[in-house]
Amino acid sequence: FNTITLKTYLMMNKILLFLAIGFATGMLSCSQQTLEKTDSLPQTYTISQERLLDKIKGGWAGQTIGVAYGGPTEFRYRSAMIQDYVPISYADGCIKNYFKHAPGLFDDIYMDLTFVEVFDRLGIDAPVDSFAHAFAHADYGLWHANQAARYNILNGIMPPASGHWLNNPHADDIDYQIEADFAGLMTPGMPNTASEISDKIGHIMNYGDGWYGGVYIGAMYSLAFISDDINIVVQEALKTIPENSRFHQCMNDVIQWHRQYPNDWKQTWAECEKKWNQDIGCPEGTLLPYNIDAVINCAYVVMGLLYGEGDFYKTMDISTRCGQDSDCNPASAAGILATIQGYSQIPEYWMKNLREVE
């Protein structure tokens, strides 16, 4: 936690919106993407710069708030949900306090910012090695797949080999999934372009299901710009993932269980626990209830989005109460929802802590 300073984080945060908005606006003006024909999504879409700004800000704000909300519970509930009678604190000043005393909690965000900064310096065609060197030499702490990839890069194993399971035992972990937000926020309404960005950057630290998690999250963010229907965003984004993959099958199960148990997220959690709670890759989780695998944790993101029904608190709370990586999961869910709804629609209760660090 002491390897990234608050000053560095705040400096990077100030450049974020400028870069993201400029990139997104440029992509909109120079790229046209043909989506799979569907009755669910518009074939053309127009968005004002004001609305674009509101959605981009919403994505980053939602992610930051979600991390802070779930932070106190992170990996304290392993293969166990957080029961309703257990309070989850969102104390006054908590985000500022985390910024000062536990900035490593925000690895979801400062990894995104590193990649954004590379785009700013080198443009949208920046080579993959530039992203790899940027985070490998950055002065902040890393864990699991990110840490293993850093070690690989510093020892001459460059991407995509740095993220491959032969060189990285954490290849299926959640790492790129929690830092892929930028890919969707920079490609509004263009999930295929978001996936292209993820193909380049996501393989620095992940492969297989770990990579699919980031592709899926990025696609949901991208589609959040052109659809206000959470069910459509969740289902259409899944088309970016191979149907025969374990990741796709799990997310599809969650969607089906939501239809079967529309008012009972805990039943869906139990079904998911029985069928999908195996972490066979991460050395820390193989023989323990600890599970940092991208599959189960992304299932918790989807559960929050579907059962949250557009309510900011409910969405975060469900993703958090599913347990395991319970700060990253509400961060993803809240970020996607706030991209759909916009920064201006985040309830004041959640904004007051964020404003202290804006």
Mark where each language-model region is:
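Helix-termini ("caps") and immediately adjacent flexible loops/tails
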Residues: 38-53, 85, 97-98, 106-108, ...
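Mature N-terminal segment immediately following signal peptide/propeptide cleavage
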Residues: 47-70
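Accessory "access/gating" subregions that flank catalytic or transport cores
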Residues: 47, 153, 162-171, 182-190, ...
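Bacterial Sec-dependent N-terminal signal peptides
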Residues: 1-40
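Catalytic phosphate/nucleotide-handling subdomain of diverse soluble enzymes
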Residues: 65, 69-71, 76-89, 205-209, ...
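Beta-strand segments within the central parallel beta-sheet cores of soluble alpha/beta enzyme folds
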Residues: 128-136, 195-200, 232-239, 315-320, ...
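Active-site cavity-forming subdomains of large catalytic enzyme subunits
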Residues: 53, 61, 111, 116-215, ...
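Active-site-surrounding "flap" and adjacent substrate/cofactor-binding loops of secreted or lumenal enzymes
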Residues: 72-103, 109-112, 129-135, 139-143
